[in-house]
Amino acid sequence: KATAVMFGKILDEQQRKAITWDVERGAPSKMIEQPWQTCTCLGDWHYNTRNLRKGYKSAALVVRQLVDVVSKNGNLLLSVPLRADGTFDEKEKAILDEIGRWLKTNGESVYGTRPWLVFGEGPIAEKGIALNAQASTTRSTGIWTAAK
């Protein structure tokens, strides 16, 4: 198991085999075989009281980004700027609580998972396999879930 990780922003394919590719505030358009990371934040990189008026990223947006990143073999580093006293503001706390509730319910779809190596590969894409699932969504989040 790795005890340290080295990151690099501008790496060719060969370098990505030894150094973890860091895609700042972005993501590749397809699954990448080597692990990679993207970093983003709820608002600004540093604490800024304007975000209380301007707003932060929503929990739904962060969750969608997390699922997209993980499905492409990536890691999401989420920066949550702290006030000078080391605490979160109320809006940040509410967003983190909502993300936490989603992960408590759906964490098994994120933690310890591995992407399919070929898009569309797997039991659902194979002929003759019946799918038994119920799906639902809420208009406010646009996040789909399926019954086990």
Show the residue positions of the predicted features:
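Mature catalytic domains of secreted/periplasmic carbohydrate-active enzymes
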Residues: 1-148
